[in-house]
């Protein structure tokens, strides 16, 4: 396995407005190819707000489809090569669209953090299946903060309070969390090929959610295979697995924080002060006043 050389990326990117949301250059420089990406009817798009369970669900789907057929891939190819990140564009590695276009497997598993309004229209036109994963805002912002601390291709997060307020204001990369989770929830009402999963449900009963995925995708995976996959995708197993824990990517400083940190529900209680929690709840109530999607901040 060739490890990409990211040494040429020496400074963190700056945030700017793009298509109505906050973005960084690594996700906009290939925009024409992203926008005009040609989806296929059997593609499966894994969509999430950053740090909401993308890698977890990517790995579940990868094992469901290819665990038996290509076991060697799971020990030699990291997940970010097996499930291309559609909008990613780093000069030192093939872009997400290029990786996806060159995939020989079927179905293609492709991940994105784009809000629903920026998804390439061919996915909808081809009636591709979309698996969306949503995570409660409080745990999501904590995970996003630690991720940005350890990842040099992300903007400088500043201190916790600064990062929290940027998130509350909807100025994090990939835009407001509120719009992201609501946008896909509303799309689900009119687009039947979209499955909406909750991170909290995955933590609570991974096997049940694997069953839901199989049902949605029309897979007849045996009970024993489902049980094995459920075991293989538990947090501690994935955290130790070099093909899923991103330890092969040199842009991440694991001395600051691991890519897979805790994988729990309710860790926000270790970060929010009482004042921050009250302020967050006030903003949340206003931003989500018309939303019908509901979240659990503890299980």
Curated annotation (Swiss-Prot):
Q: Which parts of the sequence bind 3'-phosphoadenylyl sulfate?
A: 51-56, 135, 143, 199, 233-238, 261-263
Q: Which domain of life is it from?
A: Eukaryota
A Gene Ontology molecular function term of the record: sulfotransferase activity
Q: Which leading EC class covers this enzyme?
A: transferase
What is the species of this protein?
Danio rerio
- Tell where it localizes: Cytoplasm
Q: What is a biological process (GO) this protein takes part in?
A: xenobiotic metabolic process
Q: What does the record say about activity regulation? A: Inhibited by Co(2+), Zn(2+), Cd(2+) and Pb(2+) ions. Inactivated by Hg(2+) and Cu(2+) ions.
Q: How does activity depend on temperature?
A: Thermostable from 20 to 43 degrees Celsius.
Annotated GO CC locations: cytoplasm
Instruction: Give the record's keywords alphabetically.
Output: Catecholamine metabolism, Cytoplasm, Transferase
**What tissues is it present in?**
Expressed in liver.
Q: Spell out the Pfam families in the cross-references.
A: Sulfotransfer_1 (PF00685)
- Enumerate the active-site residues: 113 (proton acceptor)
Please report which protein family the annotation says this sequence is part of.
Belongs to the sulfotransferase 1 family.
Q: What is its EC number?
A: 2.8.2.-
Known function: Sulfotransferase that utilizes 3'-phospho-5'-adenylyl sulfate (PAPS) as sulfonate donor to catalyze the sulfate conjugation of a variety of xenobiotic and endogenous compounds, including 2-naphthol, hydroxychlorobiphenyls, dopamine and T3 (triiodo-L-thyronine).
Spell out the protein name for this chain.
Cytosolic sulfotransferase 1
Entry-linked Gene3D superfamilies: P-loop containing nucleotide triphosphate hydrolases
Q: How does activity depend on pH?
A: Optimum pH is 6.0-9.0.
Answer whether the UniProt record assigns the keyword Nucleus to this protein: no
